[in-house]
Amino acid sequence: VLHADETPVSMLKPGNGKTHRAYLWAYATGAFENTKVVVYDFCESRSGEHARRFLGDWRGSLTCDDFSGYKALIASGVTEVGCLAHARRKFFDLHAANQSQIAEFALQQFARVYDIEREVKELSAEQRQASRQQHTQPVLDALHRWMLLQRQKVPEGSASAKALDYSLRRWEALTRFTGDGQLPVDNNWIENQIRPIAIGRNNWLFAGSLRAGQRAAAVMSLIQSARMNGHDPYAYLRDVMARLPMQRASQIGELLPPRWQPA
């Protein structure tokens, strides 16, 4: 199981001193996986070819939003896992705009799903799947029937129709988590790993070149992966830098954040 997301980063154009929008792509192992790693990939654009190049022939479950850049991966055999938080956000915005009763009811049902998720978070994958099948699936089945009924009533092109269509169009992917205890309910896990990058943009403003962005992405991958594994990033990097010159190439994996032990 992998999570994927991307965020814009300004990159300096060579020669003219101006910047253009590049992207930092992020890929993280699932929140329920034993190995916790995030890898950032700095690229010149948001083209889906970057995700295809990075993931290569990997074929697993990819948690992502509705961005078209992931569609070719899904068409090639990657299993799409939707983000229920994105679906919920459509109704949240709808309710904030006009106190929609449709949005209010949908939000109540999403809240029920998330209440169950909080209860099963620490369970085994098998127990989580059983609980989702018993408790979550009936809620989602009823919500789906209700959405289909409401869609027949609302005007085409209305804000309500757009919120409903987002969920209905992606329903299979959005509810895939109920059949597998290893799958997440949403993509918030990767968004949390991108948040430090978004905050950092206010301080470092732009990448000086493509190579500079790629080097920064490599270092940030180590730092954030260290955090994910409960390590102090400074202590981790200091220890690794001291040991790296003497580390055998065959044992270099021992210095990666999931396997690192302080000397």
What do these predicted regions represent?
Residues V1-A263:
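Catalytic center-proximal scaffold of phosphoryl-transfer enzymes
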